[in-house]
Regions:
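Internal helical hairpin/lid segments
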Residues: 231, 235, 241-290
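FAD-binding core of FAD-dependent oxidoreductases
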Residues: 72-85, 123-126, 134, 138-142
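Short acidic-glycine loop/turn motifs at beta-strand connectors
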Residues: 39-40, 80-81, 125-127, 138-139, ...
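A generic, well-ordered mixed alpha/beta core segment in the N-terminal half of proteins
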Residues: 85-135, 147
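Long, positively charged amphipathic alpha-helical accessory segments at protein N-termini or as interdomain linkers
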Residues: 131, 139-257, 297-341
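N-terminal lobe of the biotin/lipoate ligase/transferase fold
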Residues: 1-95
Length: 341
């Protein structure tokens, strides 16, 4: 196999997400690409999330923060230059979420941190989250990406992100800040001083930059051990402008809003869902579904299925999703049916 490492100095989230998509669909048959990148002051939401509910959009605009939407599912995250993003890109056969996660865990051990996988897609150190993962697959092409919080501004997380009470309760925590940690706070003091220089004598910006670079190097070494081959460093190829424009567009980032007269919200084990129904008499004329679920294709399928259906429990329960749809789809239909008075 071939292990390709691509690092970029670009900090524009639209360009980076475009690069990630381009690399995904241009990976060779027996190639694992490790893409390492950072975004400057950015809120990134999942494929099916509602930006108006997940983020403080007005504050984001006022502060000149980027708002971006990715192709994968999951929840909203905040990126700054204290955060490192990674993406494992591979075709079916080589793509293995468990092995890729092991690379991250090994990289943490290489810099002196005992980390572990918890929940559906998080990594923790000392019981606190420092890395969240999400996934995308299409026709045999796949990516597994995530964040690694090295020294992210804790004050900016609650400033730009709105986290629902139900989500916090499901995690058993009181606030976003209480459930996350920066790895610079977890690296043993002597090791941190060696990596970043003494605190007080080196600027925080410089120390953070050195810590991020150390984690990048650790990830590369860990990937080489996991896959048993030497990494080949490569430059980022030219990314088509229309792909960059897609990620920067209002249409992609905010989506289409509909007028609605009914809204249903619920948190399942697999994630939260917000359902907006636009009614015409007794029938559903249109609908929008938002979710932080890791699934991506299910919600557009339900949006196509419901219009024209009578708002009646038996009619809704009689609908059939495409073959292969997950059980979560029928849980959503049951939820909508139960809302009928």
């Amino acid at each position: 196999m071939k292990l390709t490492v691509i690092r970029t100095d670009c900090t524009n989230p639209y360009d980076n997400l475009a690069a990630e998509e381009y690399l995904t669909f241009h990976a060779e048959e027996d190639e694992m690409i490790l893409f390492l990148w950072q975004n400057a002051h950015t809120v990134v939401i999942g494929k099916n999330q509602n930006p108006w509910r997940e983020c403080n959009v007005e504050q984001i605009k006022a502060d000149g923060v980027y708002l971006a939407r990715r192709m994968s599912g999951g929840g909203a995250v905040y990126h700054d230059m204290g955060n490192l993003n990674f993406t494992f890109i591979a075709r079916d056969g080589l793509y293995d979420i468990s092995r890729q996660t092991d690379v991250i865990l090994l990289a943490c051990r290489l810099i002196g941190i005992n980390a572990e996988k918890t929940g559906r897609n998080d990594l923790t150190a000392d019981g606190k989250k420092f890395s969240g993962h999400a996934y995308y697959s299409s026709h045999g092409f796949n990516y597994h990406h995530g964040t690694i919080m090295m020294n992210v501004s804790g004050d900016d997380l609650p400033r730009y992100l709105n986290v629902s009470e139900s989500k916090l309760q499901s995690k058993g925590v009181a606030s976003v800040k209480s459930r996350v940690t920066n790895l610079m706070d977890q690296i043993p003091e002597d090791r941190l001083k060696k990596i970043c220089g003494p605190e007080g004598k080196t600027s925080e910006k410089t120390r953070t930059k050195k810590a991020v670079r150390e984690m990048q190097d650790a990830l590369i070494r860990a990937a080489e051990r996991e896959y048993g081959c030497s990494a080949v460093q490569a430059d980022l190829p030219e990314i088509p402008q229309d792909l960059k424009d897609k990620y920067a567009s209002e249409e992609w980032r905010f989506g289409t809003r509909i007028p609605f007269s009914k809204m249903i919200e619920h948190r399942f084990d697999w994630g939260g869902v917000e359902i907006q129904l636009n009614m015409r008499g007794e029938y559903i004329e249109s609908c929008r579904l938002y979710s932080d679920s890791l699934e991506t294709d299910l919600f557009p399928q339900i949006e196509e299925l419901l219009p024209g259906c009578k708002y009646d429990a038996s009619e809704i329960l009689g609908l059939r999703l495409p073959q292969g749809a997950s059980a979560a789809g029928y849980e959503i239909l049951e939820l909508i049916a139960s809302s009928v008075e």
